[in-house]
């Protein structure tokens, strides 16, 4: 499925960068033990690679001092995370606040323009365009400029809410079915 497949003739197109806040991550110094093993979940792409919509746990945690003394940022519940280096384009939505490393971007929709749940599903569609635009000599990288080059259709907010509810309901049913399959094995 492509952006053109979902665009309604009355929907306006916007550059992706004009409807989102793009947030960079960071890593506290690993040589300072006081920055690690705290209570703040710290995401890397290994924590959310896969088909699940939500990420709810992380392998590593940092302390408040680690967050305060590094370029790591704390994302909010509902924010979206996308891998930007190496394994480009892995995507998930946060089920709780988490910090994250510099190999990812946090994505927060501008609330007056886009519903956050709708944004997640829209990104699922444009992720292949983001991957195609990735570049790098050693490994693929999505840059801030990549988000400026992608145009997306936007229905009115009320339509976005309705679309996101339907798709969210389907995701919930898929998750239940997957849990049933896992317990049957």
Q: What are these model-predicted stretches?
A:
Residues 115-146, 150:
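Short, positively charged
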Residues 69-70, 95, 137:
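A structural connector/turn signal
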Residues 1-26, 149-162, 168-185:
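Non-catalytic DNA-recognition/assembly elements of restriction-modification systems
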Residues 100-120:
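Short peripheral tails and domain-boundary helices/loops at the edges of structured domains
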Residues 13-33, 46-77:
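Sequence-specific dsDNA recognition surfaces
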Residues 88-95:
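Short, Lys/Arg- and Gly-enriched loop/turn segments at beta-strand edges
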Residues 84, 98-105, 136-164:
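A short glycine-rich beta-alpha junction/loop motif
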């Amino acid at each position: 499925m492509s952006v053109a497949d979902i665009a309604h003739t009355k929907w306006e197109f916007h550059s992706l960068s004009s409807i989102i806040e793009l947030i960079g991550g960071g890593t506290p110094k690993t040589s300072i033990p006081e920055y690690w093993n705290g209570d703040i979940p710290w995401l890397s792409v290994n924590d959310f690679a896969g088909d699940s919509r939500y990420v709810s746990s992380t392998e590593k945690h940092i302390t408040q001092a680690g967050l305060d003394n590094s370029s790591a940022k704390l994302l909010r519940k509902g924010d979206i995370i996308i891998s930007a280096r190496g394994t480009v384009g892995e995507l998930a939505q946060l089920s709780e606040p988490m910090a994250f490393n510099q190999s990812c971007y946090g994505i927060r929709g501008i609330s007056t323009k886009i519903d956050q749940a709708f944004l997640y599903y829209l990104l699922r569609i444009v992720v292949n365009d983001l991957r195609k635009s990735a570049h790098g000599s050693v490994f693929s990288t999505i840059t801030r400029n990549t988000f400026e080059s992608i145009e997306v259709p936007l229905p009115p907010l009320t339509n976005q809410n309705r679309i996101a509810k339907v798709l969210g309901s389907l995701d919930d049913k898929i998750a239940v079915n997957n849990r049933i399959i896992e317990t049957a094995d």
